[in-house]
Amino acid sequence: MPEPLVTVQSVSVTLGGNAVLSDVSLSLAPGRITTLIGPNGAGKSTLARLVLGLVQPDSNHGTVIRRKGLRVGYMPQHIKIDDSLPLTVDRFLWLAAPGPTASRRAALERAGVAHLRRRGVQQLSGGEMQRVLLARALLRKPDLLVLDEPAQGVDVAGQNALYGLLKTVRDELGCAILLISHDLHLVMAATDEVICLQRHVCCSGSPESVSRDPAYHELFGPGAGTPNLALYTHDHDHDHDLHGNATHSHDHNGPCNHD
């Protein structure tokens, strides 16, 4: 396995007198998608901020090791933009990373929304804004991409399309991806490793092994591991656009299996 980009070793974090994380460890390696799952208040966002260097561990309670020169892209759960600002998508990206137009166009193309470059950000749908935020995170060609609830507000087909796109980004850039989610419907089938968090690591491993772990069922309920919930898969011979609609990029000489 490649050398980790970030290693968190036995870290505890206390914020405002409250223990938010306790003895947590994880390793993020290039080319792998890791997903943090857990209920609200489990410490998922705090752990992500720890990885990003925005939160420090408690004194004498673990270490965080980051590879020197690590480039990080971050996609927040929410972003507030003043409705009165006449802000185009291109300008929005420029404010995050000033540079040549070609780099912004390339990031939007990789996120599947190059056609939105001159659109006003206030005119974007929820799914379109998620793709633009992803393009923003990709501008620096990151070694590590951190996404906080990237599919929130997107329907199931759109989520599947987004996770498929993230796999493509991972393959093209060779980056590590850290996903944060509380939605079990699709995310576990779109990841290499799952870490189940409830202020500490309850269980971790492949999606299949975690879905069978008693600690996982204790946290999410006895039905959480059923195929139509945690281990949803979508085998098809078509692609999806950012709204989740099927697009036919394959050869129609044979039968189609559109769902």
Curated annotation (Swiss-Prot):
Which parts of the sequence bind ATP?
38-45
Q: What class of enzyme is it?
A: translocase
- Listed GO MF terms: ABC-type zinc transporter activity; ATP binding; ATP hydrolysis activity
The segment annotated Disordered runs over 230-259
- Give a Pfam family name: ABC_tran
Compositional bias (Basic and acidic residues) spans?
A: 233-259
UniProt keyword Phosphoprotein, yes or no: no
Gene Ontology terms: biological process = response to zinc ion
Q: Where in or outside the cell is it found? A: Cell inner membrane
InterPro entries in the cross-refs: AAA+_ATPase (IPR003593), ABC_transporter-like_ATP-bd (IPR003439), ABC_transporter-like_CS (IPR017871), Metal_Ion_Import_ABC (IPR050153), P-loop_NTPase (IPR027417)
Please state every residue range assigned to the domain named ABC transporter: 6-223
| Keywords in alphabetical order | ATP-binding, Cell inner membrane, Cell membrane, Ion transport, Membrane, Nucleotide-binding, Translocase, Transport, Zinc, Zinc transport
Query: How does the record classify its membrane topology?
Result: Peripheral membrane protein
The primary location reported for this protein is membrane
Q: What is its EC number?
A: 7.2.2.20
Q: Which GO terms describe its cellular component?
A: plasma membrane
Q: Which reaction does it catalyse?
A: Zn(2+)(out) + ATP(in) + H2O(in) = Zn(2+)(in) + ADP(in) + phosphate(in) + H(+)(in)
Complex and partners: The complex is composed of two ATP-binding proteins (ZnuC), two transmembrane proteins (ZnuB) and a solute-binding protein (ZnuA).
Function as written in the Swiss-Prot or TrEMBL entry: Part of the ABC transporter complex ZnuABC involved in zinc import. Responsible for energy coupling to the transport system.
Question: Family assignment?
Answer: Belongs to the ABC transporter superfamily. Zinc importer (TC 3.A.1.15.5) family.
UniProt-recorded name of the protein = Zinc import ATP-binding protein ZnuC
* Native organism: Alcanivorax borkumensis (strain ATCC 700651 / DSM 11573 / NCIMB 13689 / SK2)
Name the encoding gene, please. Answer: znuC
